Amino acid sequence: MNHTDIAKRVYNHTWKLDPIVRSLLDTDFYKLLMLQMIWGLYPDVHVTFSLINRNKAIHLADDIDEGELRAQLDHTLSLRFTKKEIIWLAGNTFYGQKQIFKPDFLHWLENFQLPDYELSRKDGQYILHFHGSWAYSSMWEIPALTIISELRSRAAMKNLDRFALDVLYARAKAKMWSKIERLKKLPDIKISDFGTRRRHSFLWQRWCVEALKEGIGASFTGTSNVLLAMDTDLEALGTNAHELPMVIAALTNNDDDLRKAPYQVLQDWKRYYEGNLLIVLPDTFGTEAFLRNAPKWVADWTGFRPDSAPPIEGGERIIQWWQEQGKKPQEKLLIFSDALDVDTIEKTYHHFHGKVRMIFGWGTNLTNDFANCAPQEIADLDVTSLVCKVTSANGRPAVKLSDNPEKTIGNPQEIQRYLNFFSH
């Protein structure tokens, strides 16, 4: 891979538009895995995805120029999958499986186009929605987040001169390498890049991936970013996300179907995937509710991704459940991916080492940690908690409860209904 002087590139903004998203493959791998299932099983479902800034103190509409945002969104609308990209998806091996993407799905992808967006402003925030068929609207999630995140980074650095930018990136690289030095001390650790959605920039994510590849070698198992996986000959990694049970639950017409919704998703998933792709995401409506109602066959799956409980607490609860089901945790896999920093990774690794197989999906703290790197304090280089989630399905409100109340999504009445329902 060619090395880019990131500071020079940031400073030399002499072009009309510097596209943030240059390929539809610049997304998380699980979006494509989910898309194949959505396209195959739920072609008639219409959804809305919405941008949600959890940190209301950060006024995105004041930080980011609306014209620049529209220009980036419009450019992304123009993107199509290239012939090279389709051939790579068809011919590559993912998770040890050949032809994981079926020919009819890839043929459909050849003409794929993102639906239009709806953008307005209110109280210093952008109101950004994507309406349409689930199989189309879903693919806006990652580009929307990367565009907002990188535009905010660019705005924060706009007034830095070339020397200040050199200092910023030199310090950020040194900071990143110090993390790698700590990770190298953990035998058999498995680290993956899960940092696409809230990255500082595409070029910075690429540098971080190169650094991990160089620094920890075989302990770096791959990246969730499909474009980077293709360009760097890394494994593309990812399983499934909360949007699946959120939509399926929203479509239900009775209590029995609502209770079964999280497991219906798993049954749908197993029609398409196997092996290490059989990873359970249990926390959409609370992990306790999921485990309490889970059919016996769920324990046969390869592993779990505890995504919103504290890692040690969440992992221990799943290990306890496996033991209750007569399974050996040492043969199972836990994927930790929520708000990881090196301290958390070290503590979690030492706690579970030898008890269970582990992979760490390292996200925002990998690809957007610029705290104290600038020559002067720049508040807008701090990361904001930004998500783009499904908010309705066929006109019905979608809900996510999570194990962390701060991550709850949905209108208050539906949230309360789900809380009451899944609490017993």
Curated annotation (Swiss-Prot):
Query: Its biological function?
Result: Catalyzes the synthesis of beta-nicotinate D-ribonucleotide from nicotinate and 5-phospho-D-ribose 1-phosphate at the expense of ATP.
Give me the reactions it catalyses.
nicotinate + 5-phospho-alpha-D-ribose 1-diphosphate + ATP + H2O = nicotinate beta-D-ribonucleotide + ADP + phosphate + diphosphate
Task: Report the EC number(s), separated by commas if there are several.
Answer: 6.3.4.21
Xref: InterPro entries: N/Namide_PRibTrfase, NAPRTase_N, Nic_PRibTrfase, Nic_PRibTrfase-Fam, Nicotinate_pribotase-like_C
Name of the protein described by the UniProt record = Nicotinate phosphoribosyltransferase
Report the residues modified as Phosphohistidine: H242
- For this UniProt record, give its keywords in alphabetical order, as a comma-separated list: Ligase, Phosphoprotein, Pyridine nucleotide biosynthesis
Name the family.
Belongs to the NAPRTase family.
Q: Which GO terms describe its cellular component?
A: cytosol
What does the record list as coiled-coil region(s)?
none
Q: NAD among the record's keywords?
A: no
Give the organism the record lists: Bartonella bacilliformis (strain ATCC 35685 / KC583 / Herrer 020/F12,63)
